[in-house]
Amino acid sequence: MENLTFRYSITQFTYWAASSGAAAFATTYLLSKGVPSGTVGLLLAMAGLLSCFTQPILASLADKAERFVLTQMLLLMSVLCCVCFSLQLVNGLPLMLTAVLYMVGVWSSDVMVPLLNALSVACNGAGYSINYGAARGIG
């Protein structure tokens, strides 16, 4: 039985290192771009609500899939998140597009949390060893 704790620890670390910065500075960043404070609050709340509603849907899709789609779902959400935050570097984007892209980036980042947890369970179920507590502690 192969121990994947180190690999899973790196996955947790990179996820939390990337997503924590986006969440921690969301208000400051969007206000500096000229997004009104009420709109910032609304967008971040919508990202959280969308995450709450879509997480069970994605979990259901992953559970019902005939083949292992969890990694593909994580990859898709990661790419979407990267694209949304990378587009923030483009000068001259309309203000609302900037705000919505940031919201979608935060949403796609938030929705990955249960998928990362499910990845540990799936690997353990497939016969691999992962010390979730140690890996999550590193991440």
Residues of each region from the PLM?
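Paired intracellular helix-loop junctions of major facilitator superfamily
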Residues: 120-131
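Glycine-rich segments within core transmembrane alpha-helices of 12-TM secondary carriers
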Residues: 50-52, 130-139
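Residue-level signal for conserved functional micro-sites within the alpha-helical transmembrane segments
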Residues: 19, 48-55, 109
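Hydrophobic core of transmembrane alpha-helices in multi-pass small-molecule transporters
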Residues: 13, 84, 91-115, 119
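Hydrophobic alpha-helix/TM-entry signal in multi-pass membrane transporters
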Residues: 4-12, 74, 98-102, 132
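Helix-loop boundary and gating motifs at the non-cytosolic
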Residues: 1-48
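Helix-to-loop junctions at the C-terminal end of transmembrane segments
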Residues: 53-67
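Cytoplasmic membrane-interface "Motif A"-like loop-to-helix N-cap segments
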Residues: 63-78
